[in-house]
Amino acid sequence: MSEVLFPAVRRRVVRPLARLFPSLRMSHARVLERTDHMTTTLEHPPVQHAQADIASGVLDIETGGKGRLRGRNLQPEPADPALSPALIRRHGLRRGDLVEGVCGDRRTLTDVVRVNGRTPDRRSRPHFADLTPLHPHERLRLEHPAAGLAGRVVDLLAPVGKGQRGLIVAPPKTGKTVLLQQFAAAVAGNHPEARLMVVLLDERPEEVTDMRRSVRGEVYSSTFDRSARQHIALAELVIERAKRLVEAGEDVVILLDSLTRLCRAHNNAASSGGRTLSGGVDAGALLGPKRFFGAARKAEEGGSLTILATALVETGSRADDFYFEELKSTGNMELRLSREPASRRVFPAVEPVGSGTRREELLLSGAETTALRGLRRALVARDGQSGLETLLERLRRTPDNATFLRQVQPTLPAG
């Protein structure tokens, strides 16, 4: 019965009172607080909370300090609610916060009710830059039925941990898009506690649709018909949103396709007056991509940000080669894809010898470390194509990696 009566109470009692706020000297937030108490008492879902007067979205702070609440794809829209610089300062809001507030005339927020799902409290919020980064030591398993053999191969050759900063080095037509979809399915299936974000930059619209339909997570896109500055703005807002979640102690996984295109966008948007490096790259073009990729970390205080980003190679562009050479040393995990197996329709087209993870022993048990090092030595002893095909064939015969390692360990070289 309460579910029927409460909207009527709001319509006939609460909203008329709202017109008296100035004379009563009572803020919107105070009335909403009382309204929330009524909602809880009547056991009504919070989603009914002041539907006509509440706006929510991810905060984007523009030049000059004014804020806007971005919607589903984090792209600017004319109807995005605005926040004044004073309101942002009063509540200590940061770019990337999920803000819920009272929306007055002209789509402008007059007060803030919740920040990231909680009551605003600027004093208890840590700053991302103050969190202590650690080597990843908690496993992010990609072995999952929805990931096929790809997840199992990565767990064996280049294990991923929470807070990993990984590059997927991909020549053209080596299956990187399908690989990202499989990774997304594995993360969603094995780690429902993690917030999954897929970021597609300078991509074809049909690829975006395919990704949205196949991924159980948040998919953000800026297609090839948008400007370089729009690509950059989306990437910056996504990474700021991820930082706010990590500050709250959450685990976030970002799959970016691609880091190379983000570098291209920064280079195209850079002023032509700067110093030019190899391949026509502006000297400051890599600062933005490095900030994005460098945000990945495991925080000692809790929370983590994992970024697996594709890097395009063998494209015929000197600039793309330069981007990769500059960025490859910043990661702590690398998965190399190869054209040779891909041309023979052997997938996942992983290059076993060139793939690996720094400090992988922190993610593995002692027995796993010994077994995987023996497996890598056995693969190095073969040529790349033969080693990969043998590995995939043996994996198909076993239900999981644990069984596979038990079966092959007696035959692996010691050392």
Swiss-Prot record:
Pfam families: ATP-synt_ab, Rho_RNA_bind. ATP binds at G161, K162, G163, Q164, R165, G166, K173, T174, G175, K176, T177, V178, R204. It comes from the Bacteria. SUPFAM superfamilies: Nucleic acid-binding proteins, P-loop containing nucleoside triphosphate hydrolases. GO terms for molecular function: ATP binding; ATP hydrolysis activity; ATP-dependent activity, acting on RNA; helicase activity; RNA binding. The keyword Hydrolase applies. CDD domains: rho_factor_C. It is an enzyme of class 3 (hydrolase). The keyword Hydrolase applies. GO terms for biological process: DNA-templated transcription termination. Its EC number is 3.6.4.-. PROSITE patterns: RHO_RNA_BD (PS51856). Keywords: ATP-binding, Helicase, Hydrolase, Nucleotide-binding, RNA-binding, Transcription, Transcription regulation, Transcription termination. Residues 52-119 form the Rho RNA-BD domain. PANTHER family: TRANSCRIPTION TERMINATION FACTOR RHO (PTHR46425:SF1). Belongs to the Rho family. Homohexamer. The homohexamer assembles into an open ring structure. Facilitates transcription termination by a mechanism that involves Rho binding to the nascent RNA, activation of Rho's RNA-dependent ATPase activity, and release of the mRNA from the DNA template. This is Transcription termination factor Rho. It comes from Streptomyces coelicolor (strain ATCC BAA-471 / A3(2) / M145). The lineage of its organism: Bacteria, Bacillati, Actinomycetota, Actinomycetes, Kitasatosporales. The gene is rho.
